Amino acid sequence: MIYTMKKVHALWASVCLLLNLAPAPLNADSEEDEEHTIITDTELPPLKLMHSFCAFKADDGPCKAIMKRFFFNIFTRQCEEFIYGGCEGNQNRFESLEECKKMCTRDNANRIIKTTLQQEKPDFCFLEEDPGICRGYITRYFYNNQTKQCERFKYGGCLGNMNNFETLEECKNICEDGPNGFQVDNYGTQLNAVNNSLTPQSTKVPSLFEFHGPSWCLTPADRGLCRANENRFYYNSVIGKCRPFKYSGCGGNENNFTSKQECLRACKKGFIQRISKGGLIKTKRKRKKQRVKIAYEEIFVKNM
């Protein structure tokens, strides 16, 4: 009898011990879940696509082939592999990882193209007209690399690419060549607007102004896709000043600053060179009472 009672007590003691230990691993799982939530809640900067089709989901199509292809995943913001069936599908499908990155990642958009004339032009000027996937009817302008001119088109209101300008003048200043095949006169006009003074211009030989700043400073203001009404600043490359605009809260481009000072620091630093057959003039900007003046520091003139 005594042996049986001891056995029952031992059994109940074991049960109590197991119940006391059970919450420990449950709490551990909970903590792991909390840690995982903290990691995944990290906010990423707004996604900016080069082409609207980069936002499409991977589509293997109705056929049954097994072909390795790549697509741009807007959630991971990377090009990833998927299996394509061999027919139909959509444009977010590339034969190689390199082709996917070239068409859909932002690193490619910030490259600068140098031509044989040593002029500089943002790479997005060479993108094709893209109205986007929305159904708006907004008049915009794009640079047509076939005709070498800025032309009007109808923008849907969302996505699309960076070859998209609100005004014809803005498109011409950024993407079109000057009358002699140089992107000169446009940037020369910018300098005059920045300094509120006349800068000596050569009428005999062509010259070239190079903007040595971030390429996104040359992009137009982009309100974005959402419905907020936040006060922001963008750099207006036509007049050479930072101007306010209303930001919707998502989307848009990198020419977007929370303060005028931040805009000036990002887009007005550096220097501009003037190159011509007659010589090389290096200029640096000096600030004085909120005005910028050109100081000619070094002048190298060739003996004719």
Curated annotation (Swiss-Prot):
One of its GO terms (biological process) is negative regulation of blood coagulation. Mostly in endothelial cells. PROSITE patterns: BPTI_KUNITZ_1, BPTI_KUNITZ_2. GO terms for molecular function: endopeptidase inhibitor activity; serine-type endopeptidase inhibitor activity. InterPro entries: Kunitz_BPTI (IPR002223), Kunitz_BPTI_sf (IPR036880), Prtase_inh_Kunz-CS (IPR020901), TFPI-like (IPR008296), TFPI/VKTCI-like (IPR050098). Transmembrane segments: none annotated. O-glycosylated. Gene3D superfamilies: Pancreatic trypsin inhibitor Kunitz domain. The record marks K64, A65, R135, G136, R227, A228 as: Reactive bond. Changing L117A: Results in resistant to ELANE- and CTSG-mediated cleavage. Residues 1-28 form the signal peptide. Keywords: Blood coagulation, Disulfide bond, Endoplasmic reticulum, Glycoprotein, GPI-anchor, Hemostasis, Lipoprotein, Membrane, Microsome, Protease inhibitor, Repeat, Secreted, Serine protease inhibitor, Signal. Disulfide bonds join C54-C104, C63-C87, C79-C100, C125-C175, C134-C158, C150-C171, C217-C267, C226-C250, C242-C263. Residues 54-104, 125-175, 217-267 form the BPTI/Kunitz inhibitor domain. Pfam families: Kunitz_BPTI (PF00014). The record marks N256 as: Not glycosylated. Inhibits factor X (X(a)) directly and, in a Xa-dependent way, inhibits VIIa/tissue factor activity, presumably by forming a quaternary Xa/LACI/VIIa/TF complex. It possesses an antithrombotic action and also the ability to associate with lipoproteins in plasma. This inhibitor contains three inhibitory domains. The first domain interacts with VIIa and TF, the second one with Xa. This is Tissue factor pathway inhibitor. It comes from Homo sapiens.
